Swiss-Prot record:
Transmembrane segments: none annotated. Keywords: Cytoplasm, Lipid biosynthesis, Lipid metabolism, Phospholipid biosynthesis, Phospholipid metabolism, Transferase. The lineage of its organism: Bacteria, Bacillati, Mycoplasmatota, Mycoplasmoidales, Metamycoplasmataceae. This is Phosphate acyltransferase. The gene is plsX. Homodimer. Probably interacts with PlsY. GO terms for cellular component: cytoplasm. Catalyzes the reversible formation of acyl-phosphate (acyl-PO(4)) from acyl-[acyl-carrier-protein] (acyl-ACP). This enzyme utilizes acyl-ACP as fatty acyl donor, but not acyl-CoA. Pathway: Lipid metabolism; phospholipid metabolism. It holds the Pfam family FA_synthesis. It comes from Mycoplasma mobile (strain ATCC 43663 / 163K / NCTC 11711) (Mesomycoplasma mobile). One of its GO terms (molecular function) is phosphate:acyl-[acyl carrier protein] acyltransferase activity.
Length: 327
């Protein structure tokens, strides 16, 4: 039985979507068990304990923006969920709680993979090509970075793509404001030079990539400092939502456009579904000794479903064991 520890207290939408997604996941995956960590009085409004849903009663949640020193000094639903993995009572931890607190607790309790200085947040993105995705790391865990972080993340991302997507030599690039070697900050330039000269067997390093090119499907792994990566993440999320609204407004503005929209309705629906970030559901805390996934604070049931599906693929591909072996 594979066990997931799920901190259900951090979601903006309450515990409901998290619990309902958990129920549906274990119904469809009979070899999985989920430990729901949170306020039992809230959780039991949706589900009672059974052989594959267990409840740990810990109502105290980490508040967004809470002082890290205070977070680390007390017991919360987030810390309990991570402790379950640390104590080998679960294999995976999932939370939609405060990002900074989650990262800090994961690093302190689960420890870093050997050779990794700073873990990163790593979401998976769709591209304009069917069945083609890429990972972007970091997207906010490390605002200030050193050259070695970018080099390490390139290796982490390439190993992830190799394991999860069965790509022999993933295409890797560093996010920058231009593709020329002299562009960017010193750490961009140095990491670019190191990766070019290293000619590593686990990746096909292609140099710098500009933000406008990341959705074309030419890269499997894109490395960024946390500040730039977070801007890209939020820009992409916002663009998809706003573009969908724009299309809907334009195609329903006249009678004839509405007729055309009916013909194209299926295509529009497929595009929207293809670009819906909820299908992925979360970002990895990549670089720690266990599978740790951070769901978006605004996650609904569909987003949690996406996170569970991502976790299932990772567990069944023995991602952490492969990381340790390859790195």
């Amino acid at each position: 039985m594979k066990i997931i520890a799920f901190d259900v207290m951090g979601s903006d939408k309450g515990v409901g979507p998290a619990v309902l997604a958990s129920i549906n996941f274990v119904k469809k995956n009979l070899d999985y068990k989920i430990i729901l960590v949170g306020d039992k009085t809230l959780i039991t409004k949706y589900v009672s304990e059974n052989e594959r849903i267990e409840i740990y009663d810990e109502p105290l949640e980490v508040k967004k923006g809470e002082n890290l020193k205070a977070v680390l000094s007390k017991t919360t639903s987030m810390s309990v969920a991570i402790d379950l993995v640390k104590d080998n009572k679960a294999e995976v931890v999932l939370s939609a709680g405060d990002s900074a607190s989650y990262l800090a607790l994961c690093v302190i309790k689960l420890k870093r993979l050997e050779g990794i200085t700073r873990p990163a947040f790593m979401p998976i993105f769709p591209t304009i090509l069917d069945d083609k995705k890429f990972v972007l790391l970091d997207v906010g865990a490390n605002i200030e970075v050193d050259t070695e972080y970018l080099v390490q993340w390139a290796k982490l991302g390439s190993v992830f793509a190799k394991i999860m997507w069965n790509i022999d030599k993933p295409n890797v690039g560093i996010l920058n404001i231009g593709t020329e070697d002299f562009k960017g900050f010193k750490y961009h330039q140095e990491a670019n030079q190191i990766l070019k000269e290293a000619n590593l067997s686990e990746m096909n390093y292609k140099g710098f990539v500009e933000p406008r090119d990341i959705l074309k499907g030419n890269f499997d792994v894109i490395v960024a400092d946390g500040y730039g990566g977070n801007l890209v993440l939020k820009s992409l999320e916002g663009t998809v939502i706003d573009f969908s609204s724009l299309i809907k407004r334009k195609i329903t503005s006249t009678f004839f456009r509405k007729i055309g929209a009916l013909i194209l309705k299926k295509s529009f629906k497929e595009i929207k579904e293809h670009l819906d970030y909820r299908n992925v559901g979360g970002a990895w805390v990549i670089g720690v000794n266990s599978i740790a996934v951070k769901a978006h604070g605004s996650s609904d049931e569909k987003a949690f479903k996406g996170a569970f599906n991502q976790i299932k693929i990772a567990v069944e591909n023995n991602v952490i064991e492969n990381f340790k072996e390859i790195l």
